[in-house]
Every structure is written in C-alpha cells, then in structure tokens.
C-alpha cells in the first residue's frame, strides 16, 4: 500500500495520526524533534519493498493540538501503545533523537508489542541537563521576545552541539521556513521534557529486547558518548552501528544506509 495519513480514534479525543505503507514485518518509526513523520519518508521508501512501515506523528509536533510545555512523554507513550495494538502484530520500534527516548520509554512501560528496538542517538541525560543548566531557560526567553530564530540557534548549538557557524544560520532558516518556525516552541518543550526525565539508565537497563544503536561518525561528540553509555547498560544491545560519514540526520542524508541497518536488524529475528 502507498503511504496514507491516517487517524486512529482512541479514548483521547486527539487520537493518533500516522502513515502506514508497505507489507511484511512491521517497523514502527518515532521521529525526532523539529519535524514530523515526513522526516523518515525517505527511509520508509527504501524499506517498503520488504516491510510494512508505520510512522507516527508525535503529538508534541501536531500543531493543531495545544502545546504541552509540561509534557513528560506519557501521552506519546500512550499513543504508541494504542498504535501498536491497532497494528496487531509484533513490531520493531525505531526512534530517532528525542523520538528514541520516547521509544525507550514506550518499551520500558510494556515491551510486549515489540520484538526489538532501534535507537538513533537518543540525547539521554547522564548528569547535568542536556544543553546546560540555562539552555532551555535561555531558549524560552528568546521565544518570549518573539525571536524563534534565536531560540533555535540556542538549541542547535547548546543542546545538539553544532558549531556556532551553523547556529547563526538558524534565524535565516526560521524566517524562510514556516513549518520549522511553527515547530521551534515544540522543540523547546521536547528538550525540557528530556531534561525533566533526568537520568533513566536504571530503567533502560530493564529492557531485555534486542536493541540496535545507531550513531554517526560526524555527530557531535556528546551524542556519540550518550549512545555508547546507553549501549553499556542495555542487556540486549547489539554492537553500536556507526555510519562513518554521517551525523545526526542520516535519515535525510543517507536513507539507504539507515534502511539497510534497520532492515538487516529486522531480518535477524
């Protein structure tokens, strides 16, 4: 089947919005921040000849819904379990960036619907908040002043760890891209939720499923380090798969490479 945007009715009036395409073993994708399910469309296109790919649109990034600055990801976990029940067969859950944290939280709550998990550079908290003690506060202050470009620059440099030169391009991006502009406040909510969760390594150590961790050789160092630390506590972790020429956005820049790694992992069951 071709990709169709669907809505699953649930007890929550918001329901669950997702795309569903292909047939075969199920891959359930949880996108990262500042995006929606379309960020993984290229990877899905590589996978659908052999797999059914279901891509949720995280409620945090559904701009028709009210913002939820106090989110703790619990509702997003609810959505994923509702969608897994609707799918009705075991799946491999794939999460990217903050979406990887949501995927981990989903498996921690109840691993039964899943046979495995793929996480691509989850920005887990290890000690101090991601982005430092004042990163989110400073980004929110920029938003309050009507400067979403500055907020995104703070996020990109302090939280993601990109060079300052990249950060200074963010105000330009926000001016010319209305979609990105609309998602900047949601991204800051997302980051604050991650920091609010704190260090969850003990909880993630309870995940017995096979887990494939992905990282890029050109990714900011702290994201690679967080990935390595997570791999050490997961009892079912496979060797970390490093994409030497990629960074944090290989789903867009190298979809065939990401699809190969995900596909090989799914076929291993």
Predicted regions and their residues:
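Conserved HGGG/HGGXW glycine-rich cap/lid loop of the alpha/beta-hydrolase fold
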Residues: 10-66
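Glycine-rich phosphate-binding loop signature in dinucleotide/nucleotide-binding domains
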Residues: 22, 86-89, 265, 269
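Active-site loop/oxyanion-hole signature of alpha/beta-hydrolase fold enzymes
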Residues: 42-45, 54-94, 98, 257-260
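Conserved hydrolase catalytic core segment
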Residues: 90-128
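Helix-rich cap/lid subdomain of alpha/beta-hydrolase
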Residues: 126-175, 190-191
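Catalytic histidine-centered segment of alpha/beta-hydrolase-like enzymes
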Residues: 243-256
């Amino acid at each position: 089947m071709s990709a169709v945007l669907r809505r699953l009715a649930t007890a929550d009036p918001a329901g669950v919005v997702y795309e569903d395409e292909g047939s075969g073993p199920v891959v359930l994708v949880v996108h990262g921040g500042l995006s929606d399910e379309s960020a993984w469309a290229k990877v899905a296109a590589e996978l659908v000849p052999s797999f059914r790919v279901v891509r949720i649109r995280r409620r945090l990034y559904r701009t028709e819904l009210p913002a939820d600055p106090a989110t703790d990801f619990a509702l997003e976990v609810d959505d994923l379990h509702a969608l897994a029940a609707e799918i009705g067969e075991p799946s491999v859950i794939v999460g990217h960036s903050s979406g990887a944290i949501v995927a981990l939280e989903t498996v921690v709550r109840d691993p039964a619907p899943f046979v495995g998990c793929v996480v691509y550079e989850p920005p887990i908290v290890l000690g101090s908040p991601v982005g430092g003690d004042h990163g989110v506060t400073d980004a929110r202050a920029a938003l309050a002043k009507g400067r979403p470009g500055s907020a995104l620059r703070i996020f990109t440099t302090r939280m993601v760890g990109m060079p300052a030169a990249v950060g200074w391009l963010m105000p330009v991006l926000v001016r010319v891209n209305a979609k990105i502009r609309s998602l900047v406040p949601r991204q800051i909510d997302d980051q604050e939720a991650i920091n609010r969760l704190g260090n969850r390594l003990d909880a993630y150590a309870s995940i017995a499923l096979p887990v494939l961790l992905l990282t890029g050789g050109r990714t900011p160092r702290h994201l690679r380090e967080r990935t390595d630390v997570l791999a050490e506590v997961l009892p079912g972790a496979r060797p970390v798969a490093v994409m030497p020429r990629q960074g944090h956005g290989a789903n867009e820049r190298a979809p065939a490479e990401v699809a190969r790694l995900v596909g090989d992992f799914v076929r291993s069951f």
